[in-house]
């Protein structure tokens, strides 16, 4: 009974992580805005920034991995490899969000020391969409951290179980 409950909980978390990563990818890819500054058209898109590209790629990798695990794990084919792959996915998501958040912060606030001006005032639609994507990515990272804890618990419980 307890094993089945853990499996159901992990499956629900995986579907939640899948939803969050897919939303993050779709919203970030569709984020764009343009503004006219001094008779020049300035276009803001996710692929203008390597950090946002990395974010989209990392979230996409996590989505594909999640789909694979949902279908293979139900057949019991992955075993302890899931722990390692969950850890890699958690770290990948965390690093991509960190990079994207750093760029988003510069876009919102600018950097007076480097002479970079904030751009969110000129392209608010892009910034709003990027924030939504980053929130979804953050949710995915939190869910994956919870999945990592569940995976570790599932693998380590039999090792440390007291045998009568």
Curated annotation (Swiss-Prot):
The keyword Membrane applies. Pfam families: CASP_dom. The keyword Cell division does not apply. Keywords: Cell membrane, Glycoprotein, Membrane, Transmembrane, Transmembrane helix. Glycans are attached at residue 39. It is found in: Cell membrane. GO terms for cellular component: plasma membrane. It is a multi-pass membrane protein. Residues 1-8, 75-80, 151-164 are cytoplasmic. InterPro entries: CASP/CASPL, CASP_dom, CASPL. Coiled coil: none annotated. Residues 30-53, 102-129 are extracellular. The chain crosses the membrane at residues 9-29, 54-74, 81-101, 130-150. Homodimer and heterodimers. Belongs to the Casparian strip membrane proteins (CASP) family. This is CASP-like protein 1C2.
